[in-house]
From Swiss-Prot:
One of its GO terms (biological process) is proteolysis. CDD domains: MPN_DUF2466 (cd08071). Residues 103-225 form the MPN domain. GO terms for molecular function: metal ion binding; metallopeptidase activity. This is UPF0758 protein SGO_1229. A motif (JAMM motif) lies at residues 174-187. InterPro entries: MPN, RadC_JAB, UPF0758, UPF0758_CS, UPF0758_N. Pfam families: RadC, UPF0758_N. Zn(2+) binds at H174, H176, D187. Keywords: Hydrolase, Metal-binding, Metalloprotease, Protease, Zinc. Belongs to the UPF0758 family.
């Protein structure tokens, strides 16, 4: 007589998490929990190990596209979607911890933070930061992703979040994937259009930053538009 015992592949890391806490688990163990199961060729620990060995750092994993995740051994479409959702949620939590409640003292300091967030993006991202009367960030919102043109950057959505979060002022930030930070004519027109809309609604447009690579451009510092 013999018996066959079956233990779910990722059960041990789950037990360790319950017993010791998530902070005590290795990156491989945490990733194994998220992946959940292996396949016919590899168990979940081997898949997690391969994924981690294919990137130079966890930051690189955060920047991977859905198709790049799905192209990894043992990762199908569903797991790739789940991983990207988890990565994005973690990124948003980190941004909330780093920004919300922080007082903005200079365009340079803010630009350095936004460079870390946006400089690696392959498309333009327009982000609005909403501040209270103490110049503390109370909300951050990605307005849209794509080329920044006057027709796309409608003030309506930007002001919607200002009203929703009871902000008193707004800072716009967008990236140039090329790395060049000099504003285009479209950038100037968008800035002027949104400034006028803010003034009509009683909000202050404090700045519009353009970030790319290791440099930035501040409309407040460089022009009289703001």
């Amino acid at each position: 007589m013999y018996s066959i015992s079956f233990q779910e592949e990722s059960l041990l890391p789950r037990e360790r998490l319950v017993r010791l806490g998530a902070e005590q688990l290795s990156n491989q163990e945490l990733l194994s929990i998220l992946i959940r199961t292996g396949n016919k060729k590899e168990n979940v620990f081997q898949i997690a190990s391969k994924i981690l060995s294919s990137v130079s750092s966890l930051t690189e994993l955060r920047h991977m596209t859905l198709s790049e995740l799905q192209g990894m051994s043992g990762i199908g479409q569903v797991k790739a979607i789940e991983l990207q959702a988890m990565i994005e949620l973690g990124s948003r939590i980190s941004k909330a911890e780093n920004f919300e409640g922080e007082r903005i003292l200079s365009s340079q300091k803010l630009a350095k933070k936004m460079q870390q967030e946006l400089s690696h993006k392959k498309q333009e991202h327009l982000v609005a930061l909403y501040l209270n009367t103490q110049n503390q960030i109370i909300h951050q919102q990605t307005i849209f992703i794509g080329s920044l043109t006057r027709s796309l950057a409608e003030p309506r959505e930007i002001l919607h979040y200002a009203i929703k979060h009871m902000a008193t002022s707004i800072i716009l930030v967008h990236n140039h994937p090329s790395g060049a930070t000099r504003p285009s004519r479209d950038d100037d027109q968008v800035t002027e259009k949104i400034k006028e809309a803010c003034e009509m609604m009683g909000f202050v447009l404090l700045d519009h930053l353009i970030v790319g690579g290791d440099s930035y451009y501040s409309y407040r510092e460089e022009t009289d538009l703001i």
